[in-house]
From Swiss-Prot:
Designated name of the protein: Probable alpha-L-glutamate ligase
Residue ranges that the Swiss-Prot or TrEMBL entry lists as coiled coil: none
GO cellular component, one term: cytoplasm
Pfam name, any one: Rimk_N
Cofactor field: Mg(2+); Mn(2+)
Record EC number: 6.3.2.-
Binding site for Mn(2+) 1: D248, E260
Keyword Ion transport on entry: no
InterPro entries cross-referenced by the UniProt entry: ATP-grasp (IPR011761), ATP-grasp_RimK-type (IPR013651), ATP_grasp_subdomain_1 (IPR013815), RimK (IPR023533), Rimk_N (IPR041107), Rp_bS6_RimK/Lys_biosynth_LsyX (IPR004666)
Keywords: ATP-binding, Ligase, Magnesium, Manganese, Metal-binding, Nucleotide-binding, Protein biosynthesis
Any one Gene Ontology molecular-function term assigned to this protein's record: ATP binding
Ligand binding (Mg(2+) 1): D248, E260
Taxonomic lineage from the root: Bacteria, Pseudomonadati, Pseudomonadota, Gammaproteobacteria, Chromatiales
Organism: Alkalilimnicola ehrlichii (strain ATCC BAA-1101 / DSM 17681 / MLHE-1)
Residues reported to bind Mg(2+) 2: E260, N262
Amino acid sequence: MNILILSRNSRLYSTRRLVEAGRERGHQVRVVDPLRCYMNISPHKPEIHYKGETLENFDGVIPRIGASITFYGTAVLRQFEIMGTFPLNESVAISRSRDKLRSTQLLARKGIGLPMTTFGYSPDDTEDLINLVGGPPMVIKLLEGTQGKGVVLAETQQAAESLIDAFRGLNVHFLAQEYIKEAGGSDIRCFVVGERVVASMRRQAKEGEFRSNIHRGGQASTVRITPEERSMAVRAARIMGLNVAGVDLIRSAHGSLVLEVNSSPGLEGIEKATGKDIAGTIYAFLEKNARQGKTRTRGRG
């Protein structure tokens, strides 16, 4: 197959592994920077151009689109979909999962277990928002954050109110969420490919930190997940409409809960922790499913 990877940095571990794994399996693989792509939006012959050449005749496209370029990156991916190129994850599914509020509402609608979460606008409702999640300690998440950035632990009522006031003063939206103290700063990343959990790892926050993200110094190790957790991860990815997803779970006193569904999960932590060839598994999915024009909107809302 002829595969295109949309990535701003070909030296990143995940991008390198996807190139290596594809070529090892006999595929032609090319990496292009989505921000250098530009489009001819035509009803008769839609095109994508890159540094003066036309990009065409690809069997599949693998989006590795960072959160900061979601708008433009998904526009480029959508243009490939219009041209009939099979996307590993569809543009609409990526946009859906990147919106923390929208994705939380959709997961809740389908009965997926979540930490108690509130969202509001008026300063008059701040105290009620805090009380609805059980009071401090509590987590406040910026809707635009990624890799643990914009996620703050408020340990007291005064800290919670001050943080909420500060975020409102900056005119940014946020979620207030219960803090799962019994998790001890750990969560579980389930890597879903084609409605199967193909690998899972435990991420443990470094001492003095409650965020377990690998980018923030968290340590990865192998973990055995339960059948219920496996089913929950697959369902969460399906609700988002994602073929490939990193579903983050946290174990609470009242069962496992979904923290987030990531549409562009990194490969380094989970491949090194588990020893599994996740990049190869992604290509196995593409080999089975990538067909010209086989683009359809998955998920709802």
